[in-house]
């Protein structure tokens, strides 16, 4: 997240929370569990952190997913959402992108991952640079 000036502590906390949701989703997929299980656990954490009404949109117009596979098309199956009762296959790639949306703005994380025999591996930056860079 690049910020001109400074980011309020409220927005920094929201970003930290979405990074935690991302880590929860990655952990579930890393274990080879179903994408629907990753959705349920990510959603539960977001709700526990107080973001249930703003996760992936503002209620009632929220998207009901936390990530999607990437391939020949940008959005492919499986999706981190209810009803995708299968794991991300070995060799599969997935963009994991939890966000919170408020009338005053939105913030979240997005990185792309591949699942190999050892689990989930980032193929984009995933924290290799600071989550917030101010200038």
Q: Residues of each region from the PLM?
A:
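Active-site neighborhoods and metal-handling regions in enzymes and metal-associated proteins
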Residues: 1-135
């Amino acid at each position: 997240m690049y910020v001109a000036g400074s980011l309020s502590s409220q927005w920094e906390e929201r970003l930290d929370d979405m990074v935690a949701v991302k880590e929860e989703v990655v952990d579930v997929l890393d274990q080879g569990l179903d994408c629907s299980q990753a959705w349920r656990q990510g959603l539960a954490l977001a709700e526990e952190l107080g973001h249930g009404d703003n996760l992936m949109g503002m209620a009632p117009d929220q998207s009901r997913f936390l990530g999607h596979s990437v391939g020949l098309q940008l959005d492919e199956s499986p999706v981190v959402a209810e009803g995708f009762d299968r794991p991300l296959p070995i060799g599969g790639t997935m963009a994991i992108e939890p966000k919170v949306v408020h009338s005053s703005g939105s913030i979240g994380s997005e990185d792309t991952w591949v699942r190999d025999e050892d689990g989930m591996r980032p193929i984009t930056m995933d924290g290799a640079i600071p989550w917030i860079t101010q200038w």
